[in-house]
Each structure stands twice: as structure tokens, then as C-alpha cells.
């Protein structure tokens, strides 16, 4: 009989191990659960480090000059992250099997179903019940840390790569409420999500009557840029026709397929500047680039990622790139409208003195040129009713530099 029992154990070693695990004393089960929780904590730490390495590889790969090393590093870290996540799933299953985390407990009103320790008449179960209580709390803490790590990774991705839409660009309701309250106190309108180009253009023309807004497809804008005269004349009859020029045409029933082709928005202030905004994808309200040019410039370099030959507009373009990223950080609902309204604040680029030093012209340290205030505050101008509230700064006086 003993020989038969030994042969059965040799034939089913896995089943024997499971039976032994189930028959372990409570202290040993708790020790195993705590060890698995420690393993989960180490895996979570590896996941957080891997997320930072992936972000670093993505940032290096986005630079103009880079080798294949960032791509190899990204692939290696991606495989490592997948393995860590798989290990974390296996540890979680083991914790569920040991009774630390169970579906029945998590489905109750208490998030993790943690109960007060059981007190038996002889007091034998008291210590084990307390240890199980602590193990359950540690399991909940491990899951919370994982959730926080994934949230930190998502926040960093949205900060450094805002063009990657993960569907999570929604502000908390409390934050929106506070922002709305501050805007109303400062004489500004409450934020509204402008979902279509006609709505944005109509609202902009009402607030800034002096601006001329035109929209184009990418090919039409290329023809328009190449046909612009190299003089101060800005007669639209000398260039190719835009898709539409006025919001009245939009409201009169512009076809949807025409709007879907709009990829370039031109804001023009006669004798001041011309701003080019690119939309990606075409027909959306998601800006991805912006550039400023002189009204007398023309050529193929006039596009949203180009640079003017004049220092003034080149400096404004560099500053506009920062403002664009700021507006995109608040979601695509108001990013385009806020950007266009901020661009209109440069109508006083050659007449408004610096808010900090009070002078109109000052020496720019980087370029060694005498320039007007080329920075406009964008942090507090999401939906202002009056563009005069937008403060002007020289680059040396700008709050962004300080």
C-alpha cells in the first residue's frame, strides 16, 4: 500500500504540490502571500522605470538627428515592459488563489472586501486574521501604485507628445469649474467647445473684425503661397482662391466634403503679419503647427512649419510653438479657437509697449537686435472678451524666461 501511494505521488507531482499548498498552515500561506506582494512591488518598480525609458527613447527619436539606437532601445524596453506586465498578471492570479484578492470580495461594497479579524474563543485565529488583513491592504496598495504609475506615464506622454491622442484629454470637472469661475471674474466668457470650423471662424470674426480668415486645402495653399507677390500688396485676386473666406458662406450650406479638405488656415492683418495654421487631420479642429510671416513675403517656404526671413516674425513663430503646446494641453475642444484668438493679440505687435519695462523697443540679447515686445501672455487668454488684456513682453522680460 505504501509503495502504491509513492507511485501515485511520482505520477502526479503537480497535483501533489497543489494539495500540499492547500494544506499548508495559515502562517505559511501568509508568508507566501507577503512574498508575492513583495515580488509585485518589485515588478511595479520595473514597470515605472521601463515607462521612463520608453518616454526617453520616444523623445530622442523625435529629434531631427538621431540614429537607429533609440528605435532599438524602444523595442527592447517594449518587450521588457510586456514581460513585466505578464509577470504582474501571474502574481495577481497567485494572490487570488491564495485568497488575498478575490472577485467575490472585490464585488462587495467595500472595494477590497477587507473584514475585521475573526476572534475565536481560544484566540488561535486572531494572529492569522490580522496578518490576512494586512496582506489584503498591501494587495490593494500594490494595485493602487500600479494605477498611479500608469497615470504618471499617461500624463508624461500627453506632456511631451501631445499630438498622440489617447482619448484621455478631458479635464476634471472641478478644474473646469474653477477655470470658468476665474474667467467670469476677470470679465471673460465661459469656455465653450467649438467643434466645427464655421463656429470658430464666425466667433473670431465677431470678436476681431479687422482680421481676415481664409482656409485652404494643402495643395491650394501651396499654389497660393507660390503666387503671392513679393511686395506689400496682399490682394487676394492675385492668388488662387481659398476654399472659403467668410463664415456667411459656411452658414449658407457649405458642403461637408469641402470642409473635410480644409488643412490650412490663414489669418491676415493688412500691413502687419500673416499667420499660417496647419490642421491635422484635414477637416478637423486640431492644430499641429503655426508660423508667422510678413505680408510682403511669398514663396514655397510659406507654410505652418516654415520660418520668415525677418527676425521679428521668426521670433514670434518660435514663441507661438510654445503657446500651441500649452493650448493643446487643455484638449482639442478649445485649442484651435484659443490659438487663433491669441494670434489676433499680435495686432498691436508694433504699437503696444512692454508690460514689465514699459518700453516699446529693447535690445534682444540672443539676436543682438532692437525689437518690439514679441511675446504675448497665453496662460490667461483662453477665451478673453477683450484682446487688450493680453500682456506684451520683450523676450528678456517674458515670464516664460523667468
Swiss-Prot record:
Signal peptide: none annotated. Pfam families: Med27. GO terms for cellular component: mediator complex. Its main location: nucleus. InterPro entries: Mediator_Med27. Residues 1-30 are annotated as: Disordered. Component of the Mediator complex. Belongs to the Mediator complex subunit 27 family. Component of the Mediator complex, a coactivator involved in the regulated transcription of nearly all RNA polymerase II-dependent genes. Mediator functions as a bridge to convey information from gene-specific regulatory proteins to the basal RNA polymerase II transcription machinery. The Mediator complex, having a compact conformation in its free form, is recruited to promoters by direct interactions with regulatory proteins and serves for the assembly of a functional preinitiation complex with RNA polymerase II and the general transcription factors. This is Mediator of RNA polymerase II transcription subunit 27. It comes from Arabidopsis thaliana (Mouse-ear cress). The gene is MED27.
